[in-house]
């Protein structure tokens, strides 16, 4: 019997995903109907066509849902069904799911309802809460194909420790979401699933590599999801969909039994964290997970208990703002957001200073070398198993041109020394901000862009990273939405003279009409392992904005 071609395997997988949706929820023309109705925003369109009683559920935050379930106002079954229905439609518009298992989710919801009915108690803080998972988070009996055709039909036997922690506390899993090939790209495209579009504007990219997660959350079809981040993969999709998110430092949240590219590459390790529509949900998730003391099971975790930093919300923290990295200037709405956040903080009595990163180019060069150290051997090898081509966006991010062949151990050690040098330079830069501040103390946190645009057209050559400095330096980052693009205000700067070709490409890409109404998100960054402080800093910023 002939081995099926990669095209056949990919087509069968896509059909399998669609066939996992109940017949009454299959709408093959829904994307066309949405466009013909004049909508580009999937969240708004789904609110229009779905039952009001389901919207009432899916528009709540995770904490609000948990409270309502614990009070008996909603059953786990009704909550799960509402999110499954919305996810089914969102996938058919955005192409954001790679595994769908609604039947299992609804069965689990019924079991939780039975427990609640008998005991009048919830099994844990996530009782009855549907949580979506990035494809790489292992579940028994489910593929973790991470964008490769070769990994289809090879289900996992173990459950990721993080998933087990959530499940034991009452969470319900119902989908796994799309990723780019090898999860090494800032947009979500693979030969396996195709392209994943932006939930708030289907003409644009959802970002990557947690792009399926970002799209699902942005459409309102998830209240909380799990992403991973090695160069911006949690932050970029969260930014493009107006979400909150946490990229933690290494060693705070378990990566055990999470499938990964370049497993064992520890110079710039991937981390795992929550994405949600509420900052309080991010805080709730992180505190609950860290309180589970998973370091007793996962040897890579650091035994650092959760430290309540709520007192910092009343302290006047000192912020440093990074407006540009000196290589690619962010688009006008992002510059406006940075100026406005400074004004808002200063009006509320916070000290804000401007900072710059003089070694940004060296840092980016080092990141690319780390990611390309095997001369793309792993990706080429996995792709060649089925003959599928390496997708172009991954080729740009993981080069086979920098090194002709995988580098030697000695060259890897040299790279390790370069990473250490950059971390030291960054720490010294941070500590030296004390010279600039009125108090003589160094800054508490940095506010920076996440990307130089609020999204981009699918398949665009948009590759410049504002995120990777904080990966190489292992800093926690919190994403928060600050404003939206306003085509009447955020006009193109026709007098701007680009600094280089990459800057010119980014500048030429800007179209205020195309990006109108897109969210403008920023990231707040603290020193390594200061997740609690980072969340408190984000909360302080949001309080200033609200007030």
From Swiss-Prot:
GO terms for cellular component: cytosol. GO terms for molecular function: amidase activity; fatty acid amide hydrolase activity. Transmembrane segments: none annotated. This is Putative amidase PB8B6.03. Keywords: Cytoplasm, Hydrolase. The keyword Acetylation does not apply. GO terms for biological process: amide catabolic process; fatty acid catabolic process. PANTHER family: AMIDASE-RELATED (PTHR46072:SF11), AMIDASE-RELATED-RELATED (PTHR46072). It is found in: Cytoplasm. The active site is at residues 134, 209, 233. It is an enzyme of class 3 (hydrolase). It catalyses: a monocarboxylic acid amide + H2O = a monocarboxylate + NH4(+). Belongs to the amidase family. Its EC number is 3.5.1.4. Pfam families: Amidase.
């Amino acid at each position: 019997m002939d081995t099926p071609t990669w095209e056949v395997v990919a087509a069968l997988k896509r059909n399998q995903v669609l066939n996992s949706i109940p017949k009454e929820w299959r709408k093959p023309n829904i994307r066309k109907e949405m466009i013909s109705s004049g909508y580009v925003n999937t969240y708004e369109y789904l609110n229009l066509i779905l039952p009001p009683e389901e919207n009432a559920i899916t528009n709540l935050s995770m904490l609000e849902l948990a409270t309502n379930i614990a009070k008996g106002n909603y059953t786990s079954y009704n909550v799960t069904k509402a999110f499954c229905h919305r996810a089914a439609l969102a996938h058919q518009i955005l192409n954001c799911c790679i595994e769908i298992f609604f039947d299992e989710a609804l069965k689990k919801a019924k079991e939780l309802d039975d427990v609640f009915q008998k005991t009048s108690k919830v099994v844990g803080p996530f009782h009855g809460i549907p949580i979506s998972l990035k494809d790489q988070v292992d579940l028994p009996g489910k593929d973790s194909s991470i964008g490769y055709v070769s990994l289809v039909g090879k289900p996992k036997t173990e459950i990721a420790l993080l998933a087990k922690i959530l499940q034991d506390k009452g969470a319900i899993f119902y989908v796994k979401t799309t990723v780019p090939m090898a999860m090494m790209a800032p947009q979500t495209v693979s030969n396996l699933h195709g392209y994943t579009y932006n939930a708030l504007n289907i003409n644009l990219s959802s970002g990557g590599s947690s792009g399926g997660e970002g799209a699902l959350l942005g459409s309102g079809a998830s209240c909380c999801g799990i992403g991973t981040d090695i160069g911006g993969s949690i932050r970029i999709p969260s930014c493009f969909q107006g979400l909150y998110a946490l990229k933690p430092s290494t060693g705070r949240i378990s990566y055990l039994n999470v499938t990964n590219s370049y497993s064992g590459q520890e110079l710039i390790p991937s981390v795992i964290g929550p994405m949600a529509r509420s900052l309080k949900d991010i805080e709730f998730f992180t505190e609950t997970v860290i309180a589970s003391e998973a370091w007793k099971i996962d040897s890579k975790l650091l035994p650092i208990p959760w430290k309540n930093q709520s007192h910092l919300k009343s302290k006047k923290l000192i912020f440093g703002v990074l407006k540009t990295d000196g290589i690619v200037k962010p688009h006008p709405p992002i510059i406006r957001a940075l100026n406005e956040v400074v004004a808002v903080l200063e009006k509320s009595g916070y000290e804000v200073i401007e900072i710059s990163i003089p070694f940004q180019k060296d840092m980016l060069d080092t990141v690319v070398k780390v990611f390309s150290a095997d001369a793309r051997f792993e990706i080429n090898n996995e792709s060649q198993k089925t003959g599928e081509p390496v997708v172009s966006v991954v080729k740009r991010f993981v080069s086979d041109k920098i090194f002709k062949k995988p580098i030697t151990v000695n060259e890897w050690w040299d790279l390790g020394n370069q990473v250490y040098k950059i971390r030291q330079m960054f720490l010294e830069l941070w500590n030296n901000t004390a010279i600039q501040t009125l108090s003589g103390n160094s800054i508490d946190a940095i506010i920076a862009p996440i990307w130089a645009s609020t999204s981009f057209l699918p398949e665009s050559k948009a590759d410049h990273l504002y995120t990777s400095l904080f990966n190489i330096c292992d800093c926690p980052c919190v994403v928060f939405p600050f404003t939206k693009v306003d085509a009447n205000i955020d006009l193109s700067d026709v007098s701007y003279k680009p600094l280089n070709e990459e800057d010119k490409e980014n500048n030429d890409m800007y179209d205020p009409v195309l990006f109108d109404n897109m969210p403008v998100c920023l990231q707040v960054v603290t020193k390594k392992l200061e997740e609690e402080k980072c969340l408190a800093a984000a909360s302080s910023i949001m309080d200033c904005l609200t007030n």
